[in-house]
Amino acid sequence: MGKNKDVRITITLECTNCPQNKLKRYPGISRYTTQKNRRNTPNRLELKKFCPHCSLHTLHKEIKK
């Protein structure tokens, strides 16, 4: 009897500030990959992470793959 692996999924977090910000250090959009538990957090995940393109801590939201 193995564990059900479908509960924990891999998601991508994308910076919400990068598309609007014109004064970036270099072009591009910051993305992080992480895992979340579907039972504990059924809605979209939002975290404050460091964006190397904006050189700031910004809000990163979960995106669809």
Swiss-Prot record:
Keywords: Chloroplast, Plastid, Ribonucleoprotein, Ribosomal protein. Its main location: plastid. It comes from the Eukaryota. One of its GO terms (cellular component) is ribonucleoprotein complex. GO terms for molecular function: structural constituent of ribosome. Pfam families: Ribosomal_L33. The keyword Repressor does not apply. PROSITE patterns: RIBOSOMAL_L33. GO terms for biological process: translation. NCBIfam families: PRK00504.1, PRK00595.1, rpmG_bact. Belongs to the bacterial ribosomal protein bL33 family. This is Large ribosomal subunit protein bL33c. It comes from Staurastrum punctulatum. The gene is rpl33.
